[in-house]
A protein has these predicted regions:
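Active-site mouth of glycoside hydrolases
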Residues: 1-176
């Protein structure tokens, strides 16, 4: 990581989006926070302030812990997985875990000047049509749009000093 962030610094990069995953929090919350802190220390050494992405609606909806499948050569983001996975997204009884994740991660780093911003949900309206659309719940967008305000509320409750945002996929979100 140090080597690659050094390359990024050499190219003039001063920020980057870093995608996190709720399953890693579920597996080992304290270890996850420790690793994020280590990453932030390395990034700061290279004058890079990341935007941490908490949730993502793009690519493989069947995320799981453990050994991941090998990347497919020549396929863009072939190993990328969504957070939350489709099972969690469709199960409101799992939402307290998501709340714990958001409040725990954001709360731990709410005043950390090494972080530029929090992208609460990347492309919440992306239906993943070109890659995994056939695996997605038919009502995925409705599920995400119902959870999105809650995710923002959790991040606000954690009292983040950094801006909160959501990188939308398409359309006019001014009324949301």
């Amino acid at each position: 990581i140090d080597l690659e962030l050094g390359w990024a610094e050499g190219l003039g990069m001063n920020t980057m989006r870093v995608f996190l995953h709720d399953l890693l929090w579920q597996q080992d919350a304290e270890g996850f926070k420790r690793r994020l802190d280590q990453f932030l220390t390395i990034a700061a050494k290279h004058k890079i302030k990341p935007m941490f992405v908490l949730f993502d609606s793009v690519w493989d909806p069947d995320a799981k812990l453990g050994k991941q499948r090998a990347p497919k050569p020549g396929v863009h983001n072939s190993g990328w997985v969504q957070s939350p996975n489709r099972t969690t997204l469709q199960d409101p009884s799992a939402y307290p875990h998501l709340e714990s994740y958001v409040k725990g991660v954001v709360g731990a780093f709410a005043r950390d000047q090494r972080i530029l911003a929090w992208d609460v949900w990347n492309e919440p309206d992306n239906q993943n049509g070109g890659s995994y659309g056939d695996l997605e719940p038919k009502n995925k967008v409705e599920l995400v749009l119902a959870l999105l305000p809650r995710a923002f509320a959790w991040a606000r409750e954690a009292k983040a000093e950094q801006p909160l945002t959501s990188g939308v996929w398409k359309g006019d979100w001014s009324a949301q």
